[in-house]
């Protein structure tokens, strides 16, 4: 049995990863009805690390608990959750031939926690040994547009990293990290300031190249 492909969607908050993920899953199934596709995301809702991340990101602190602004604390939690995710969800699925679409992966931690002050190269090193995606789609757009979109999402909870200046740093770091890693990885930067259908078509073009679809 051939292994599935590992596809990752990345981008700052409001970039549209949660919109494009389901569209990509639908497209993969439409192109080949034999495709079994898993849409997953990080931080997870399954591991103790992911649950702790989600609690802290949304500011759901316990009485007397303080906000932690330590980039090492955050990066360790994210990487622990990612390692759990790979060992328990992503890896087993890929080995079964499932096509895995992951909303956020290593570029997220590399970009966010380097914006907090950790060395980017150190964060890259900490991810060595984890599966390398077959394709990473980095959805890039101006922070102003991303924040407008995020603000219109009534289902979205305001999070710890929701700050304009911080998101500007994260956006820059995403692009720097993509350039650093693209020598050894398949990373495509996509302009996600455009309408949803235009973004989806460009993603589909990259998927066609990856799978050899016509």
Model region roles, listed by residue range:
Residues 2-6:
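Pre-Walker A (Motif I) flank of P-loop NTPase domains
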Residues 9:
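Hydrophobic anchor at the beta1->P-loop junction of P-loop NTPases
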Residues 12:
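P-loop (Walker A) phosphate-binding loop of NTP-binding proteins
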Residues 17:
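Conserved lysine of the Walker
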Residues 20:
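Hydrophobic positions on the alpha1 helix immediately C-terminal to the Walker A/P-loop
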Residues 25, 144-214:
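NTP-dependent small-molecule kinase module
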Residues 34-124:
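ATP-dependent small-molecule kinase phosphotransfer cores
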Residues 104-172:
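A glycine- and Lys/Arg-enriched "phosphate-lid" helix/loop adjacent to the NTP-binding pocket
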């Amino acid at each position: 049995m051939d292994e599935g492909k590992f596809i990752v969607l990345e981008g700052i908050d409001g970039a549209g990863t949660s919109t494009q993920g389901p569209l990509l899953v639908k497209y993969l199934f439409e192109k080949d009805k034999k495709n079994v596709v898993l849409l997953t995301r990080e931080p997870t809702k399954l591991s103790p690390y992911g649950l702790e991340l989600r609690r802290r990101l949304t500011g759901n602190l316990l009485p007397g608990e303080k906000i932690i602004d330590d980039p090492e604390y955050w990066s360790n939690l994210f990487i622990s959750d990612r390692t759990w995710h790979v060992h328990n969800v992503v890896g087993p699925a890929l080995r079964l031939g499932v096509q895995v679409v992951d909303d956020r992966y290593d570029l997220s931690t590399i970009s966010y926690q380097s914006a907090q002050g950790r060395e980017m190269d150190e964060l890259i090193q900490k991810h060595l040994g984890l599966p390398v995606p077959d394709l990473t789609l980095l959805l890039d757009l101006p922070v102003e547009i991303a924040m407008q979109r995020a603000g219109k999402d009534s289902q979205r909870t305001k999070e710890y990293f929701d700050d304009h200046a911080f998101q500007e740093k994260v956006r820059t770091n995403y692009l720097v990290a993509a350039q650093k890693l693209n020598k050894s990885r398949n990373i495509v930067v996509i302009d996600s300031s455009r309408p949803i259908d235009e973004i989806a078509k460009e993603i589909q073009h990259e998927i066609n190249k990856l799978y050899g679809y016509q």
